[in-house]
């Protein structure tokens, strides 16, 4: 399964460049709330429920994996498939990443509690996709959520 099958153009947001993204300062909790809203809309789950599961996981250990990337994730009993959202913060933000650097790309995933193996494969796919610095830089420079989504589609097509 491709990551772009878990996303939609409506769940990719570039902060400060998309009209839906607030230009004010962004805290870690604010970012989780934005991602939860995007995921909740797609999955048909209340935003607060998604935000709580992402925040609970984040409280265990930061999902900031380094190189400007964070992958907030969690599981919900009432889901029957995985959903993903991408928040791009071009100026970077503090996220308590393991390498101590700012995070620019926040790729969130929620899925069913019973699908642990599938969930782990998705997290690994995201990590592999974002390993390439040139590709990360392209995403960070994207002018809109649609442009970023199109980059993801092209990158996954090239890797097939």
Each model region followed by its residue ranges:
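Cytosolic covalent-transfer regions centered on His/Cys nucleophiles
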Residues: 1-160
């Amino acid at each position: 399964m491709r990551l772009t099958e878990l996303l939609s153009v409506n769940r990719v947001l570039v902060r400060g460049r998309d009209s839906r993204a607030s230009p004010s300062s962004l805290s870690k909790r604010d970012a989780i709330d934005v991602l939860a809203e995007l995921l909740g809309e797609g999955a048909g789950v209340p935003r607060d429920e998604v935000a709580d599961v992402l925040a609970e996981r984040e409280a265990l250990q930061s999902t900031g994996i380094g190189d400007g990337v964070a992958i907030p994730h969690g599981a919900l009993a009432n889901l029957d498939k995985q959903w993903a959202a991408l928040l791009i913060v071009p100026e970077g933000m503090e996220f308590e990443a393991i390498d101590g650097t700012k995070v620019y790309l926040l790729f969130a995933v929620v899925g069913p509690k019973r699908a642990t193996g599938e969930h782990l494969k998705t997290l690994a796919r995201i990590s592999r996709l974002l390993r390439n610095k040139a590709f990360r830089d392209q995403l960070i420079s994207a002018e809109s959520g649609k442009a970023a989504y199109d980059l993801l589609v092209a990158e996954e097509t090239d890797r097939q």
